[in-house]
Every structure is written in C-alpha cells, then in structure tokens.
C-alpha cells in the first residue's frame, strides 16, 4: 500500500495464524486477535483458570472450553454455583448444571423468548415471575422442594384489620386466598429457578459476578 499497490499478492508470514476477527460489543467494533475467558472464584476475587481462544469465539462457547479444560486440569476443584451473563442463557446450560448439582445464576437474554402462556391463562414476566390474567405480578409464597415446584399467590389479597379480602377489581378466583399457581421447575429450568430471579437471594448472589471486573483490574 505504501507504493500505491492495494491488491498485493506477495507471500506473507503470519506469526499467529490462529488469530481471527471478533466483535467487541462494548466498543462497537471488530478486532483481530484472541479472546480471553477467565473463570473467577467469586468469594476471593482470584482467577481460577484463564483460557485463550480465537477472537470469533462466542462467550457461550468460550465458557465451555474454559470450564471443561479447568475440570481436566483441576479435578478436585469443587463448583457449587455459576454466575454467568445473558450470553450463556441457553437451555443446555441449565440441564447440564442440574445433572451436576450446580446452581446456575444466569441473567435472562430478552431475545431468547418466553412461552406466551403458562397453565392456560398465565404469562411469564421477564424475570420468570408469573403474571395473572388481570396483569398483576404474582407474589412468591415459598417452594415445595419435594414436589420440585415454586408457589406464587395472588398479590391483591389483603389481611388488613385481620380480615382476608381480595382488592382486585376483576378477581380471577373465588378462593379465600385468591388465585395460586405452581411453577414446576422441570417445565422450564431456564425460566424457573430456585431461588427465582425476582428474589433478594438471587440478586445478592448474582451481584458477586462483579468479581470478574475486579480480577481483571
């Protein structure tokens, strides 16, 4: 190009032939090189296993390469929880972690979709909380571990003055405590988590994912 030749067919020497092109979403540009996937211990903020791959490797694939290589190099290292961003929000991840008795804390990818209807007339909100036919987010009412399901109840039930009453303008049930729905975890392990994404427990645990940024610094 320095000599005005834009289409040069001269032989070239590539010192790093396995480099390729990747997309940096934070900088909104392409780059040439490698991608570093670092597995971090969220309690100590210390790196556990670094793994380099081609720049074109998607984060979801980078995790698989790093995770299974880590397990081969560190077979005694115990993993009980994983904290991952929405790039890893795919059903096979949840199914694998369940088989391995690992609790996943994975942010939902809004582009991955949700079932339009659950149990005939409920919809599922963006964080996995059921929404009643009247459009109200249901209130969590515990988990039945033996049955593998979470219980959500009507949020419009009032106990004011020691009396139980429904404050909804269009109640969808005549039951004393209003409408109840059970989310069966096996129905959709991606959407239905224990603890659920709407809970303080989930958010507190997921906040520890910032250990990645602290480790990189």
Q: Model-flagged regions — what are they?
A:
Residues 71-73, 117-118, 129, 156:
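Short, intrinsically disordered/low-complexity patches at protein termini
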Residues 106, 128-132, 161-167:
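Contiguous terminal or domain-adjacent regions
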Residues 111-116:
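Short gly/pro/ser/thr-enriched loop/turn and capping motifs at secondary-structure boundaries
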Residues 22, 153-194:
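Long, low-complexity, polar/charged, intrinsically disordered or flexibly structured peripheral segments
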Residues 1-99, 105-109:
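Polybasic low-complexity intrinsically disordered regions
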Residues 11-35, 171, 184-189, 193, ...:
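Alpha-helix-centered segments that form part of catalytic cores
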Residues 118-150, 185, 189-217:
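Short amphipathic alpha-helical "interface-anchor" segments enriched in bulky aromatics
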């Amino acid at each position: 190009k320095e000599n005005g030749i834009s289409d040069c067919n001269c032989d070239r020497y590539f010192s790093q032939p396995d480099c390729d092109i990747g997309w940096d979403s934070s900088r909104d540009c392409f780059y040439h090189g490698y991608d570093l996937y670092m597995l971090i211990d969220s309690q100590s903020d210390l790196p556990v296993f670094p793994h380099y791959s081609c720049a074109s490797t998607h984060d979801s694939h980078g995790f698989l390469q790093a995770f299974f290589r880590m397990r081969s190099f560190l077979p005694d290292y115990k993993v009980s929880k994983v904290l991952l961003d929405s790039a890893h929000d795919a059903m096979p991840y949840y199914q694998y972690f369940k088989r391995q008795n690992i609790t996943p804390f994975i942010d939902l990818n809004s582009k991955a979709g949700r079932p339009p209807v659950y149990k005939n007339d409920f919809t599922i909100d963006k964080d996995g909380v059921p929404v009643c036919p009247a459009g109200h987010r249901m209130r969590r009412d515990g988990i039945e571990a033996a049955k593998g399901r979470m219980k959500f109840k009507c949020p419009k039930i009032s106990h004011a003055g020691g009396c139980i009453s429904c404050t909804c303008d269009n109640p969808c049930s005549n039951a004393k405590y209003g409408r109840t729905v059970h989310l069966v975890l096996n129905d959709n392990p991606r959407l239905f988590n224990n603890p659920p994404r709407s809970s303080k427990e989930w958010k507190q645990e997921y906040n520890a994912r910032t250990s990645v940024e602290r480790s990189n610094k």
